[in-house]
């Protein structure tokens, strides 16, 4: 493992030039202190986790110190926000500090969120508050533990710097890790500003650095776009299967790598509700749970439009047409596994849809249902979960078909239990748990944030003394309103 001064750097994106980003120094926050750090994220940089407790760690990730090799940059991009094009967005409060080259030959962006004003701040103060920084940290690491592709969170650094939102809050900085911070909106920016040369430079950069397997294809750009479509189909399938709602699926929040990116007013489903809206600013439900699939397709079509400078329209349309069948295949595979099924039958999707309809009518806790379904042999488990449903006739009919389906599966009850426990989490990041940790942190107690992070890092394993994190949320905890304010 390495010390902080032993990291290797290779700032590839910064070398693209000033057309793609602006050099900006971070604005330090006062009295920086470590709130929480992720050991597994530190391992991506080969960093010794013990170094998180050193004063220099907080100084480096709060803007007080910089590595000599750092080249902090605010990236420029645009994007469609709630369906309307915004021609100039960019990093309004974040900086790409540097790219770390680890011992495995992987490049990891160090991105400092809440680093102060940039040319793209648009009247904002460039700061992030403690609560939003904690929420992004917890979500990044929780999704990673669930096997959902995501950016990672290295740490949150708190401070005594005041900032004003609805009330006075304290500023914080979150260090995000990703192998690229290029978004769909980067390509839209150069397309709509009619800068084809710069756009081709960006496309070649992404192809060379992030999709090298596509370079030797007959049409490398089209092969890259197809891979982006494939990755997004799998990503959204995982969101839907695990009940994750992003909340702000603007094209500037879509990663070119097909990972979960830019966490705001997200939520995991508590009671199953296909029409659930986690962002209280989303009056029309554009980014509701049910709409995430068509919105992902819409966003990919926006990316495709931006790529028409280098790819013919018809091949782009054909490739876009792959998204929905790919999504459906991934989603059905994940739901089979959540139900303990290892083989495929023609009526499996109908079985899943009928279950979700029963859940919708009964207000059934989405995550706990699957966990309880795997606790015992199928017939016994159905008796346990039956009490959670309202339409008992419909559930009993579903249960009979599910039992018959299980009877056609190979293996025994114990094997089924192990399979289901390996894919059905006991612990999920519920908004009320995050809120309790945030309130403690705002009062100066970081122990709950760290404890919750540790619990969520092992979501499938029962952890002694942590039963409170596996409970159904109280009524007040189901209706927390989360906005984009951060």
UniProtKB/Swiss-Prot annotation:
Catalytic center residues: 252 (proton acceptor)
Residues the record lists as binding Mg(2+): 253, 262
Cofactor names: Mg(2+); Mn(2+)
Protein family: Belongs to the SELO family.
Catalysis performed (reactions): L-seryl-[protein] + ATP = 3-O-(5'-adenylyl)-L-seryl-[protein] + diphosphate; L-threonyl-[protein] + ATP = 3-O-(5'-adenylyl)-L-threonyl-[protein] + diphosphate; L-tyrosyl-[protein] + ATP = O-(5'-adenylyl)-L-tyrosyl-[protein] + diphosphate; L-histidyl-[protein] + UTP = N(tele)-(5'-uridylyl)-L-histidyl-[protein] + diphosphate
Keywords, in A-Z order: ATP-binding, Magnesium, Manganese, Metal-binding, Nucleotide-binding, Nucleotidyltransferase, Transferase
Biological role stated in the UniProt entry: Nucleotidyltransferase involved in the post-translational modification of proteins. It can catalyze the addition of adenosine monophosphate (AMP) or uridine monophosphate (UMP) to a protein, resulting in modifications known as AMPylation and UMPylation.
NCBIfam families: PRK00029.1, PrtAdtaseSelOPseudom
RNA-binding as UniProt keyword: no
EC number: 2.7.7.-, 2.7.7.108
Binding site for ATP: 90, 92-93, 113, 125-126, 176, 183, 262
Class in the EC hierarchy, top level: transferase
Protein name as catalogued: Protein nucleotidyltransferase YdiU
PANTHER family xref list: PROTEIN ADENYLYLTRANSFERASE SELO, MITOCHONDRIAL (PTHR32057:SF14)
Pfam families (UniProt xref): SelO
One MF annotation (Gene Ontology) recorded for this entry: magnesium ion binding
